[in-house]
């Protein structure tokens, strides 16, 4: 059973919801001011606060009115510390309340502003008393701007009264740099949380820039009970020092190259491929800047490292496949992910250049985004893996028109297996045909853009182009407008007959008319008749192809070329649409007949494992990116020596003086 107290009803509701989400539904949240009206009193003595085994709290930071209504209701919470918390700051008041309501062997975790670690006056006195009691087991410094409503940096005080008498110090973690930007706030990643937990639980001190066990003497005698994390852990990066000699004479300082030792230890031959020794303290670059990444990828040891990464992932896959291919209702999703995480960390722990916590982040990010839902669906329903044969329509709400508010089907997707995976597995030929047609569309559109961009501003094509685009109907209208006034003997006769088709509406009339007007023979269609459409077609041919005057030739040709490209785009877009529709139907039908083996292969191997490996492979790619970026940075920093820059400056100065003199000015 869990217990809590909250003054604000809204926040109390959130606390209850949070408990349910964490599968702790049995919780009681009472209302009231924790300081002036504590709700949990000892059952045998109503004048004594009830004590608890575990307390977790994230109280309001720096509360200014915490003493309101407190007189006579202190319940001994603030006695024995040498002073009272400041009237305008309730941070230590919360901590003292928690310490009072904690059992003699109880444990607590409290989130408080960083200031509680080092502020002076009354708070310093209280802090010293708490430190001397050895109740603080650990301090975890968190990133700033982590919580909504405040950008203040916070920390977690881990309290453990059990074993306090024999406690030799405080375990400190500086996790202030482990986060990712999320909008205008910072957010702890899964890897950051996991690193904090494992480092604290296992008391890991292999990275002194992240965590240390601080002896009592260092806290009490050396730092006067000041717990500011920066006094004990220096998490800052080493200063990137500029080398004056290298700026003057050139060369990359050996001290900077040695700073990349973690890479050279794994890829020893790569160092000699990229760099040559100038002297004991300086190197030169052997390859051009743009060839560095290619040189790294071609390096045998770099490739071998990639193979080791593949082997580590393959070993993890081999271990997890039997588990992930036999999920049922007896499996706990929570226990499953813990096992998956522990195993992937074990496999990647020996790969020195890839942080095991990065591998953890890849897995946890995919679990939270996709895999958790998949596993939950499989283990929570009797259908299990056969859910993979199901497909679901994608619906969107109609936002306007007479059907506004109704839902319409806009597509479909596999319930467990994305259709992209099914297409890749069974319909590669059809997919290639679609991609080929799409490539033609893209290439044709590119040609059309080039044609528009190359057109003269005064051209007819430029007149119909808008924001670099044209429409076929606008091009056709422009062609008609340009050529409609073109006249020949034939067009004159055709225009006459077009206005009075009765002249040729019978076979006898047609034959008689053609004897006197032989130029009109070109409009007789395949049925032996002259119609309005056959006349219009002939007029179009005459005016746009046969009799275009030289003054209009360039414009008409350009418009016709653009129209041809537009038509090609339209035709192939239709091809793409038809092919997609046919593939969509075949793909959906294929879901229904997936075999059990196909389901496991598509779901476990192609969806889960391939997605996770994609993230792992990004870590491998990042190695070359980081190494390349650093070497280029160093090479460019010392590429131009001071004498060279000085010489270049003198040359430019001479050129400027020469130009000024030619303009009639003198520069002394």
What is each model feature region?
Residues 49-415, 419, 429, 434, ...:
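A conserved structural/catalytic subdomain of Rossmann-like adenosyl-cofactor enzymes
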């Amino acid at each position: 059973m869990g217990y809590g107290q909250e003054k604000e009803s809204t926040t109390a509701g959130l606390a209850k919801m949070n408990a349910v989400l964490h599968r702790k539904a049995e919780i009681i949240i009472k209302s009231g001011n924790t300081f002036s009206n504590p709700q949990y009193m000892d059952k045998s003595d109503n004048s004594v606060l009830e004590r608890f085994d575990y307390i977790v709290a994230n109280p309001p930071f720096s509360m200014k009115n915490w003493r309101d209504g407190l007189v006579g209701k202190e319940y001994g919470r603030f006695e024995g510390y040498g002073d009272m918390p400041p009237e305008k700051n309730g941070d230590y008041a919360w901590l003292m309340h928690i310490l009072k309501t904690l059992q003699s062997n109880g444990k607590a975790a409290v989130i408080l502003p960083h200031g509680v670690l080092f502020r002076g006056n009354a708070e310093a006195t209280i802090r010293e008393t708490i430190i001397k009691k050895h109740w603080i087991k650990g301090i975890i410094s968190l990133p700033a701007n982590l919580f909504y409503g405040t950008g203040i940096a916070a920390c977690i005080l881990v309290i453990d009264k059990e074993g306090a008498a024999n406690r030799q110090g405080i375990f400190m973690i500086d996790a202030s740099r482990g986060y990712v930007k999320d909008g205008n706030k910072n957010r702890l990643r899964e890897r950051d949380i996991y690193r904090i937990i494992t480092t604290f639980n296992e008391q890991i001190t292999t990275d002194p820039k992240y965590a240390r066990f601080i002896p009592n003497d260092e806290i009490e005698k050396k730092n006067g009970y000041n717990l500011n994390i920066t006094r004990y852990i220096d998490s800052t990066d080493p200063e990137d020092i500029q080398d004056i000699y290298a700026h003057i004479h050139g060369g990359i300082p050996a001290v900077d190259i040695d700073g990349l030792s973690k890479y050279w230890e794994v890829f020893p031959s790569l160092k000699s491929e990229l760099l040559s020794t100038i002297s004991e303290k300086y190197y030169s670059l052997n390859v051009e800047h743009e060839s560095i990444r290619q040189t790294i990828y071609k390096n045998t040891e770099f490739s071998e490292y990639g193979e080791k990464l593949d082997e580590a992932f393959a070993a993890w896959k081999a271990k997890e496949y039997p588990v992930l291919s036999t999920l049922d209702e007896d499996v706990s999703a929570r226990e499953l992910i813990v096992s998956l995480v522990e195993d992937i960390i074990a496999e990647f722990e020996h790969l020195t250049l890839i942080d095991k916590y990065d591998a953890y982040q890849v897995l946890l990010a995919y679990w939270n985004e996709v895999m958790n839902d998949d596993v939950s669906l499989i283990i929570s329903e009797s259908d299990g893996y056969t859910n993979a044969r199901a497909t679901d329509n994608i619906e969107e709400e109609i936002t306007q028109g007479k059907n506004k508010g109704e839902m319409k089907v806009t597509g479909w997707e596999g319930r467990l297996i994305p259709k992209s995976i099914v297409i890749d597995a069974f319909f590669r030929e059809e997919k290639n045909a679609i991609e080929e047609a799409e490539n033609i569309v893209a290439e044709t559109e590119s040609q059309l853009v080039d044609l528009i961009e190359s057109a003269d501003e005064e051209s007819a094509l430029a007149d119909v182009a808008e924001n670099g685009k044209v429409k076929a109907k606008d091009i056709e209208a422009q062609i008609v407008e340009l050529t409609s006034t073109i006249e020949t003997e034939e067009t004159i006769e055709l225009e006459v007959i077009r206005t009075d088709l009765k002249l040729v509406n019978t076979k006898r009339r047609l034959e008689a008319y053609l004897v006197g007007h032989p130029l009109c023979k070109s409009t007789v269609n395949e049925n032996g008749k002259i119609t309005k459409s056959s006349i219009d077609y002939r007029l179009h041919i005459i005016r746009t192809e046969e009799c275009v005057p030289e003054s209009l030739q360039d414009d008409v040709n350009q418009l016709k070329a653009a129209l041809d490209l537009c038509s090609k785009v339209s035709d192939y877009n239709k091809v793409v649409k038809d092919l997609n529709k046919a593939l969509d139907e075949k793909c959906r039908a294929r879901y229904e007949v997936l075999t059990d083996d196909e389901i496991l292969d598509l779901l476990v191997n192609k969806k889960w494992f391939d997605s996770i490996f994609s993230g792992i492979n990004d870590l491998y790619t990042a190695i070359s990116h980081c190494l390349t970026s650093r070497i280029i940075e160093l090479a460019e920093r010392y590429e131009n020596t001071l004498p060279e820059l000085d010489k270049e400056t003198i040359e430019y100065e001479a050129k400027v003086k020469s130009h000024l003199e030619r303009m009639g000015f003198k520069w002394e």
